[in-house]
Amino acid sequence: MLQLIKKDILFNWKWALLLVLVAVLMPVLFFIDREETRFILWVYIIGSVLANSHFVSKSCYMDDSAQTRRFLASLPVRRAQLVAAKYLLGFLCMVASIGLTSLSSFVLGLYPSVQGALIAFLYLLLYYAVFLGVFFHSNYSNAEKTNTALMMLTIMSVFVLDRTGLRLDEMIIEPTYMLAGLGTCIMIFAASLFFSVRSFDHFQVGDSR
């Protein structure tokens, strides 16, 4: 499975580099308003979305071709491992992007936001659950449309939250909300993985979907 992840990184190293750059540089854009804690929250939300919106997506794009599918089918790995590798790649990307954003914020003196990091983590669990679920159940084209819709929904949500003044960062830090949100997102992510494995197990190489 690690070899599959290594393959994705090597074949898509430009997008992996973009993920790193966005995660590191996003706090710089908000450095001018370092006293406003709400902006620190948006650093995590917008930064994590932008950082994670292309790397795994381009990896799925490569795997959606008939030639790549034949190659993957010839590997001595189970199809469940092929699916799990994509979900693990997504998980590693979200951890890396949030970690790099936190480090960059700390260096700039913005002080990493626990609330922002947690909200970004919960969002990305849902993001990959939906995107990868659509990819393995359908195809890359539909998954990419879903990716665009999720991006637009996120931007609209940030705008609405900012306009209404709803302190999502204060709500999510409450133990009840935090545990409920974390548990729900993990279950959705796990369910997406489970059903994607079942769907891909019945997929025949060469199918056009």
Give the predicted meaning of each segment:
Residues M1-Q67, V83-R209:
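Hydrophobic alpha-helical transmembrane segments of membrane proteins
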